[in-house]
A protein has these predicted regions:
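Short, structured helix-loop boundary elements
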Residues: 4, 41, 87-90
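Bacterial N-terminal signal peptides that target proteins for export
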Residues: 1-10
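Sec/Tat signal peptide C-region and signal peptidase I cleavage site
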Residues: 20-23
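Bacterial N-terminal signal peptides
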Residues: 9-18
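A solvent-exposed, acidic/Ser-Thr-rich amphipathic alpha-helical stretch
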Residues: 61-62, 66-135
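Short, low-complexity N-terminal intrinsically disordered segments enriched in polar/charged residues
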Residues: 25-71
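Short beta-strand segments enriched in hydrophobic/aromatic residues
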Residues: 55, 69-70, 77, 136-138, ...
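A beta-strand edge to alpha-helix "cap/lid" segment located at domain peripheries
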Residues: 25-35, 108-183
Length: 183
């Protein structure tokens, strides 16, 4: 009898505990956004600045770029609303910047001396971190340091990790004239 009571009590405890754990793992739909500090905003802005620098130089064979993402992070480009190749995980992200198995060779924007600029950055807190939207400009196209092109915008999801703020996902919405593409 005591064994049956102990099992019944344990089962009842599990029935209460498991849903509570499951509920605690994901924020409720009406969960309040995190309160970001001024330092959080600065660190997220620095993440975007580091992104530009890593992309423009293919530093550390593209792994400096890849390490700006979470281990399961995703970069997803779109051109005029059409999805492009999806880059997920460290190796694929290094390739997105021209590195990894590509070895930073024949990277068009690097060969032209292009620099990426990210103005109009808006950061919004969420229950799990923050989201952001930022425009993208490219300067130096075709080797002309005075040529600037608007190349759409990014939608970002940021999360704070033990290593600092990282991209959980980054979607580039390229808006290009038909048939024109930076080469």
């Amino acid at each position: 009898m005591k064994l049956q009571q102990a099992l019944t009590t344990a089962l009842a405890g599990l029935m209460v505990t498991i849903p509570a754990i499951s509920h605690a793992q994901k924020p409720a739909a009406n969960a309040k956004p995190l309160v970001l500090t001024a330092l959080d905003y600065i660190e997220i802005e620095q993440l975007v600045a580091k992104y530009s620098r890593a992309l423009d130089t293919c530093s550390n064979n593209g792994y400096d770029y890849a390490d700006l993402y979470t281990p399961d992070g995703v970069f997803a480009p779109e051109i005029n609303g059409k999805p492009g190749p999806r880059f997920e995980g460290r190796e694929r992200l290094a390739e997105a910047s021209g590195g990894g198995k590509l070895g930073c060779k024949n990277v068009p924007w690097i060969q032209q001396g292009v620099r990426h600029l990210y103005p109009n950055h808006v950061i919004t807190p969420t229950p799990t971190g923050a989201v952001g939207v930022v425009d993208m400009l490219m300067i130096g196209l075709g080797g002309d340091p005075n040529k600037i092109e608007y190349d759409g915008y990014y939608d970002d999801v940021y999360v704070k990790t033990p290593q600092g703020w990282r991209f959980k996902s980054r979607t580039h919405h390229a808006v290009l004239s038909e048939g024109l593409r930076v080469k």
